Curated annotation (Swiss-Prot):
Subcellular location(s) per record: Mitochondrion inner membrane
InterPro entries, A to Z: Mit_carrier (IPR002067), Mito_Metabolite_Transporter (IPR050391), Mitochondrial_sb/sol_carrier (IPR018108), Mt_carrier_dom_sf (IPR023395)
PROSITE patterns per UniProt: SOLCAR
Gene: slc25a30
SUPFAM superfamilies referenced in this protein's UniProt entry, alphabetically: Mitochondrial carrier (SSF103506)
Membrane topology per record: Multi-pass membrane protein
Reactions this protein catalyses: sulfite(in) + sulfate(out) = sulfite(out) + sulfate(in); thiosulfate(in) + sulfate(out) = thiosulfate(out) + sulfate(in); sulfate(out) + phosphate(in) = sulfate(in) + phosphate(out); oxalate(in) + sulfate(out) = oxalate(out) + sulfate(in)
Name the record gives this protein: Kidney mitochondrial carrier protein 1
GO MF annotation list: solute:inorganic anion antiporter activity; transmembrane transporter activity
Length: 291
């Protein structure tokens, strides 16, 4: 067992922030698409956007280009905490069990990914709640990040900042438990097969593959998580559209059909794909720094 290495924590946070800034407008359209069409919520009952590109154009025209970056501050803060802990914990857990990357297995990496995803997402949940509120409600939410943090706390209490934490942890367990192992195993086999070396092209192909796998696995829980986090009035259950995560899942399926659970899939994949490509290429380049 080797000593704790600080580099994966720092590099993971920096690469996560870089990837978040590069793909944020796509993430915002995903959120808008996922919260619309809820028959039991008058505010989000209307189908305002026909797809990702239509959403981007309409938001730009009606709310301005700055609206495409609504929630970017808490998103960056989230990645500074979530991304740092996620990658650092994942890499540290792997080295706890095996000393050499060649000895890693898919099962081991998946276990480490699930655990690191749960821990990091629980810690970063308040920033995720604020990011989704600011994305979904756009210019309706007045003030900056700190003001809105305080407003959520005053109106909904501490529980409001950790609303949807179980779903966030479930989604993180799925995403991290799929993406990081798929990336590592794909990269490992490409290199060991002799088809490709440890180059940026290998990193690109591996990150593209893990982004697709993560989007397919996580989209249903992402839809439910987004709707639960965007729901308000936690202190007055009678005003809540959904009684819990299972109720949200069942109501969405019943009222809108099974494929409603894959609302926002294309922007989800089109975000996870580029996000992972930017993240892993940045991370791999940072690893090469002689620090």
């Amino acid at each position: 067992m080797t000593a704790l290495n600080w580099k994966p924590f720092i590099y993971g946070g920096l690469a996560s922030i870089t990837a978040e800034c590069g793909t944020f407008p796509i993430d915002l359209t995903k959120t808008r698409l996922q919260v619309q069409g809820q028959p039991n919520d008058a505010k989000y009952k209307e189908i305002r956007y026909r797809g990702m590109m239509h959403a981007i154009v309409r938001i730009w025209r009606e709310e301005g280009v700055k609206a495409l970056y609504s929630g970017i501050a808490p998103a960056m803060l989230r990645q500074a905490s979530y991304g740092t802990i996620k990658i650092g914990t994942y890499q540290s857990l792997k080295r706890l069990f095996v000393d050499c990357p060649e000895d890693e297995t898919l099962v081991l990496n998946a276990f480490c990914g699930v655990l690191s995803g749960v821990v990091s997402s629980c810690i970063a949940n308040p920033t995720d709640v604020l990011k989704i509120r600011m994305q979904a409600q756009g210019n309706v939410m007045q003030g900056g990040m700190i003001v809105n943090f305080i407003n959520i706390y005053q109106q909904e209490g501490t529980r409001g900042l950790w609303k949807g934490v179980s779903l966030t942890a479930q989604r993180a367990a799925i995403v991290v438990g799929v993406e990081l192992p798929v990336y590592d195993i794909t990269k490992k086999h490409l290199i060991l097969s002799g088809l490709m070396g440890d180059t940026v092209y290998t990193h690109f192909l591996s990150s593209f593959t893990c982004g697709l796998a993560g989007a397919l696995a996580s989209n249903p829980v992402d839809v439910v998580r987004t709707r639960m986090m965007n729901q308000r009035s936690i202190r007055d259950a009678s005003n809540s559209s959904y009684k819990g995560t299972l109720d949200c899942l069942l109501q969405t399926w019943k009222n809108e059909g099974f494929f409603a659970l894959y609302k926002g899939f294309w922007p989800n994949w089109l975000r996870l794909g580029p996000w992972n490509i930017i993240f892993f290429i940045t991370y791999e380049q940072l690893k090469k720094l002689n620090l």
